[in-house]
Amino acid sequence: MSSNISIVAIIPARYASTRFPGKPLIQINGKTMIQCVYDQVRSTPEITEVLVATDDDRIEAEVLRFGGKVVRTLPEHPSGTDRCFEAYQKLNKPFDFIINVQGDEPFIQPEQIRTLAGILTPDVELATLIKKIEDEETLFNPNTPKVLVNANGEAIYFSRQTIPYLRQHADKKDWLANHTFFKHIGMYAYRPDILAQITQLKPSALELAESLEQLRWLESGYSIHTAVTTIETVGIDTPEDLLRVTHTSS
């Protein structure tokens, strides 16, 4: 990353959630989850500016309460990527890159954001984080997207299926010992002109098959660079996730 590259980090946050309504406002160690995420992002030196993108009065009020910056967005966005683009447009200030940080990962580490920022150069269109898979449960879990990369670190394909298939090893228990598999971590960096383009694309066949929005970009010919992190990411999707992580950290 060039030292003069400017980056705005946008944290999309919705109150409505099928599995965990209101989760941005849940308390974790004395702070709301959205403040936990905001504080972690703000402490990353490479980030020029941080803001929350939300369609909810309660989340907006909470961000203003702890002194954060917030942009109101429309409620009907199909993805965090679309919400980020609207927020960036309303910011009305140019940046070299936008990083989309998930609003339900209160334990995101600044080092992970630094790792992603570290591969950003003017010729990068899109970028994301990946991590080596260490256990069989993750390897074969369809809720954990896997990724294949080429020799230049660009994503070839993302899938909920375990990829690649090791034909020479019929016993899948041998797979981790014989190949390095990577999982995708859903933090994205976009060049602004590319973000404007990908939000105009229609859903693609592969995206609909796998339910992974990044496949739309690959199918349309965009390049997604990857950065490898060694840090595990813990997202909170359900009340059970919250109980597990707070119990572990206490």
Swiss-Prot record:
Enzyme Commission code(s) on record = 2.7.7.38
Picking any one GO molecular function of the record gives: 3-deoxy-manno-octulosonate cytidylyltransferase activity
Q: Which UniProt keywords apply?
A: Cytoplasm, Lipopolysaccharide biosynthesis, Nucleotidyltransferase, Transferase
| Keyword Nucleotidyltransferase set for record | yes
**Swiss-Prot/TrEMBL GO biological process terms:** CMP-keto-3-deoxy-D-manno-octulosonic acid biosynthetic process; lipopolysaccharide biosynthetic process
Pathway in which the depicted protein is active: Nucleotide-sugar biosynthesis; CMP-3-deoxy-D-manno-octulosonate biosynthesis; CMP-3-deoxy-D-manno-octulosonate from 3-deoxy-D-manno-octulosonate and CTP: step 1/1; Bacterial outer membrane biogenesis; lipopolysaccharide biosynthesis
Q: What does this protein do?
A: Activates KDO (a required 8-carbon sugar) for incorporation into bacterial lipopolysaccharide in Gram-negative bacteria.
Q: Which PANTHER family match?
A: 3-DEOXY-MANNO-OCTULOSONATE CYTIDYLYLTRANSFERASE, 3-DEOXY-MANNO-OCTULOSONATE CYTIDYLYLTRANSFERASE, MITOCHONDRIAL
What this protein is called in its record is 3-deoxy-manno-octulosonate cytidylyltransferase
